[in-house]
Amino acid sequence: MNIAFQETYFKMKNLNLLVCEGNTPEEGKVFQDVGIPTHTESLKESLSFYNKDLNIDVLNPCLELNLKKIIPNLKKYDGLIWGGSSLNIYDDTIEIRRQISFMKECFKSIKKVLAICWGMQVAVTAAGGEVKKGVNGSHIGIANNIELTHDGSINLFYKDKNKNFNSPAFNFDEVVTTPNNAIHLASNKINTIQSLYFKTGVSEIWGLQYHPEITYKKMIAIIKFRKDILINKRKKIKNENEINKHI
């Protein structure tokens, strides 16, 4: 995220922002129980670095009751930031369907949307695109050699940013079909779509597959916490020694 974008959108006083948690409440509690900040907490911390005069509401769109309360009031928000999750969108659970449905409601009312990792996958799906399991591997802690496209280099989000950069990242899935009229902003060897920009409804959406809001310290904590899943379920890493070398 570049200085021009920060100055335009995050340093204005009294902005009303809605921050959405991508994980289920149960998953969020698992994070908190082991001392790892939730994705929403990481987002709020990052935002406070740029601007302490923001009015931030936090929502978990997995909960139907939350959605009924907030949908009539969405127009009050200047922007939406939607964070990461351990969910896979093709699993099509009720919690995932609620998130997609709520994103569609946001497209009717909120003009600026920053959708990060899972958030981008929800936004893309809600706008008619498609997300599948990644075919070129996964990111476990870091995305290396993210390259801006020409369109990315002239987009406000990346103005004056290095054309090649690394970022914290943790994902197993990827966007395979973008929404109509989407502009491809960045890629790397793992994910063709590392970031994109598109418009739908009243919204402008910037979608990122990587995690600019998460510190490497938190990523290391997540990797250690997820080691059993990474080894036995995801089968992305052979053993604990390999995890230690990876870190």
Per-range role (PLM):
Residues 77, 85-151:
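Cysteine-nucleophile active-site neighborhood
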Residues 29, 91-92, 124-126, 179, ...:
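Short glycine-/acidic-enriched loop or helix-start segments at secondary-structure transitions
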Residues 18, 57-59, 81, 114, ...:
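Hydrophobic/aromatic beta-strand patches that form the interior of the parallel beta-sheet core
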Residues 22, 129-217:
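Pocket-forming structural segment of enzyme catalytic cores
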Residues 212-247:
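C-terminal helical/coil "lid" or tail adjacent to the Rossmann-like core of SAM-dependent
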Residues 32-34, 94-97, 127-131, 182-183, ...:
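Short, glycine/charged-enriched secondary-structure capping and boundary segments
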Residues 71-75, 122-125, 176-179, 197-198:
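Short loop/helix-cap segments at secondary-structure boundaries that form the rim of catalytic
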Residues 1-109, 233-247:
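N-terminal beta1-alpha1 cap of cysteine-dependent amidohydrolase-like domains
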